[in-house]
Amino acid sequence: VESILAIETSVPEASIALWSDGAWLFEAEFVSDRNHNSMVFEPLAQALALLEGRELSTVLVGTGPGSYSGTRIGIAAAQGLAIAKSCPAAGIGSIAATPPARSVARPAAAHTAATAIGDARRGLYYISSITASGEAEEPELMDAAVLEQRLASIPDDLLFTLDAPTTLGLNDQLQERITRTQPQARLLVDVWLGLDEVRRQQLYSKPLAPTYLRAPFTSKAKQGHPLLRKG
């Protein structure tokens, strides 16, 4: 019996889902901008109680892009559960676990390709295409002008965003093509079930880490800071 617990906390609309032997045993959503850390544990405990002695096979966690603190909380919870339950954990890009991304993986889908767009802040935006395996490519950064050119070159793609479309700096025609959506824990499981064993093992072997739009920024201590003074 395969039992999979999924955690998605990269967005304020967080969710947890438990799937076992072809059936959904538990799903919960909770909304929080600041305190995922205090809200995630109750639904996790409720989900684990429903295992009723069955072993947990895998813990999945959405790795963003999204809230840095929210994503880190989900990763920490996944790591802790994997240790406690002696099972592997794997991270999946949250963009793939959205309804538009999953819709192109269905037979006879209206669209055969999907691309996510997002606000990367400081005048930059990102795009991420959904691969044939159902996963999301690494986000690619660009300015507004290049973004419009890229989107105009893929007129048949299903476009979606985790942000408000009005924040993307696009013309009205392109905005009308874009669907706003959110990742869901149950769709992390959906992505996972569609992967072959080779890809699953690759994901197991990768350390859990957030999907960064930019390299993590570390501020340098100013000259004269107590830590820089010579003893």
Predicted regions, residues:
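Short, well-ordered alpha-helices that flank and scaffold nucleotide-derived cofactor binding pockets
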Residues: 46, 79, 83, 104-105, ...
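Oxyanion-binding and handling regions
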Residues: 1-24, 31-39, 90-231
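Phosphate-handling active-site elements
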Residues: 49-56, 82-93, 108-110
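DPxDG-like acidic metal-binding loop motif
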Residues: 60-94
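Generic structural marker for isolated residues within well-ordered, non-membrane alpha-helices
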Residues: 44, 78, 99
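Short, conserved beta-strand segments within well-ordered enzyme catalytic domains
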Residues: 17, 29, 58-60
